[in-house]
Each structure stands twice: as structure tokens, then as C-alpha cells.
Amino acid sequence: MSKALLRFVRLSPTKARLIARQIQGMNAELAIASLEFTPNKAARVLSKVVASAVANGSLDAKSALIVSCRVDAGPVLRRSIPRAKGRATAIRKPTSHVFVEVAEGKEMKSSKSHKKNQAEGK
């Protein structure tokens, strides 16, 4: 089992968790391919972390399985923006810590279409 950790990335943890849940349990090669076509900043970041985890363990991406994909909240950068009448309001710029574990395995996450095809006997 190999791991990769990316800390203090300027990315909202709630938005990144949406993508992280989708790739958990998937084959690493399939996950990287699907993330490549996802129009999201979190997808680009997660793709690089998954590739790094595969490389850290000297694994083959075709046989690697994403065991765990976790996105934790990092510190929040606070900035201020000037407003009317001399006031200023805060802007929160959240950061995240992305953690991916990859292990040797050949099972793939079953999708709805795959289950449907199996039920029909295709």
C-alpha cells in the first residue's frame, strides 16, 4: 500500500470531497482518466495526487486500486475587501489537505451501467 499527501492546497474541502467520493474504490488508471475530463479544479489536483500515490509505491496504474481518498480542511486564509462607508468585510480563502492511499488490486468500482449490463446478461 502506498500513500500520497498534498497539504495546504488552495481548494475548498467541501468541493474537493464531492470529487474524492466518486473515485474512492476505483481502479487508479480509470480514476485518472475520468478526472482528466472533469471540468473542476479539484479534479486536476486529485488526479496528480493519485498519480503520485501510484508512483510512490512503484505500482502499475492498471492494477492499482484507490483504497482511500480523503480531503481534510486546512487553515483558512482571511482577506478583507473594502466596502462602503469605510467598512471592510472578510473573505475566506479555504485550504485543504488531500490524502490518497493506493493498493495492489484489480477490482473496479461498479457503476450503475455496469450493474445494469450484468443484470441483462450482456
Swiss-Prot record:
UniProt keywords, alphabetically: Ribonucleoprotein, Ribosomal protein, RNA-binding, rRNA-binding
GO molecular function annotation: rRNA binding; structural constituent of ribosome
One cellular component term from this protein's GO annotations in UniProt: cytosolic large ribosomal subunit
This protein's record includes keyword Ribonucleoprotein: yes
Highest taxon of the lineage: Bacteria
RNA-binding listed as a keyword: yes
Disulfide bond sites: none
Record CDD domains: Ribosomal_L22
GO BP terms in the entry: translation
Spans annotated as Disordered: 102-122
Record-linked InterPro entries: Ribosomal_uL22, Ribosomal_uL22_bac/chlpt-type, Ribosomal_uL22_bac/org-type, Ribosomal_uL22_CS, Ribosomal_uL22_sf
Family: Belongs to the universal ribosomal protein uL22 family.
Task of the protein: This protein binds specifically to 23S rRNA; its binding is stimulated by other ribosomal proteins, e.g. L4, L17, and L20. It is important during the early stages of 50S assembly. It makes multiple contacts with different domains of the 23S rRNA in the assembled 50S subunit and ribosome. The globular domain of the protein is located near the polypeptide exit tunnel on the outside of the subunit, while an extended beta-hairpin is found that lines the wall of the exit tunnel in the center of the 70S ribosome.
Subunit structure: Part of the 50S ribosomal subunit.
Protein name: Large ribosomal subunit protein uL22
Organism (species): Helicobacter pylori (strain ATCC 700392 / 26695) (Campylobacter pylori)
